[in-house]
């Protein structure tokens, strides 16, 4: 973690609502004192509803879709905070334990979820609507980029408190 005056790191994160890959992080830190650091970072996180389930198309195309899904939700989070080294590791042995606190703006990025739908033996790409679409006529999900031009931004605030091992 912190062996110099200034450091940066990036990575891929996993979270309980994010699927296989939850998101990504980029963080910069600068030393304030021996065990205390100022941090500035940005995270982009995929947020899935806990009840999302993938289904295979009843039409036999091998494509999957999520019944009931209206939007993809990503959270873009800016963070400014502090990190305190609680236990420092000895050279290449042991573990380091850090306490972290950060706060900053969040922007929820809502992107409409589109499906490929069979209507009158033709495939159509449409925004999912359970009052219009029937389960057995869904071919699968459309490209993620299908609704990108209809993105909606929802502002908010995020607070992060963590112990890092």
Cite the ranges covered by each PLM segment.
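Flexible, solvent-exposed coil segments and beta strand-coil junctions
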Residues: 1-7, 54-64, 135-144
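Short loop/turn motifs that connect adjacent beta-strands in outer-membrane beta-barrel proteins
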Residues: 1-6, 31-39, 70, 86-97, ...
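Short glycine/proline- and aromatic-enriched beta-strand/turn motifs that initiate or cap beta-hairpins
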Residues: 1-45
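Residues that define the transmembrane beta-barrel architecture of outer-membrane proteins
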Residues: 6-8, 18-22, 36-38, 72-76, ...
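Membrane-embedded beta-strand positions of outer-membrane beta-barrel proteins
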Residues: 10-12, 40-44, 78, 99-103, ...
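Transmembrane beta-strands of outer-membrane beta-barrel pores
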Residues: 14-18, 30, 44-50, 82-84, ...
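Outer-membrane beta-barrel translocator/channel fold
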Residues: 41-92
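Outer-membrane beta-barrel transmembrane domain signature
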Residues: 100-165
């Amino acid at each position: 973690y912190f062996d110099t005056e200034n450091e940066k790191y990036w990575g891929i994160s996993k979270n309980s609502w994010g699927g296989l890959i939850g998101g990504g992080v980029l963080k910069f830190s600068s030393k304030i004192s021996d065990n205390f650091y100022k941090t500035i970072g940005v995270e982009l996180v995929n947020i899935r509803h806990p009840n999302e389930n993938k289904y295979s198309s009843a039409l036999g195309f091998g494509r999957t879709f999520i019944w009931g899904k209206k939007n993809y939700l990503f959270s873009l989070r800016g963070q400014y905070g502090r990190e305190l080294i609680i236990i420092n590791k000895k050279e290449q042995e042991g573990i380091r334990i850090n306490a972290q606190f950060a706060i900053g703006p969040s922007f929820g990025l809502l992107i409409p979820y589109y499906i490929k739908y069979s209507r009158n033996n033709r495939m159509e790409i449409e925004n999912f609507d359970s009052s219009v679409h029937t389960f057995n006529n869904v071919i699968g999900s459309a490209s993620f980029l299908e609704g990108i031009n209809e993105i909606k931004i929802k502002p908010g605030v995020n607070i992060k408190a963590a112990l890092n091992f």
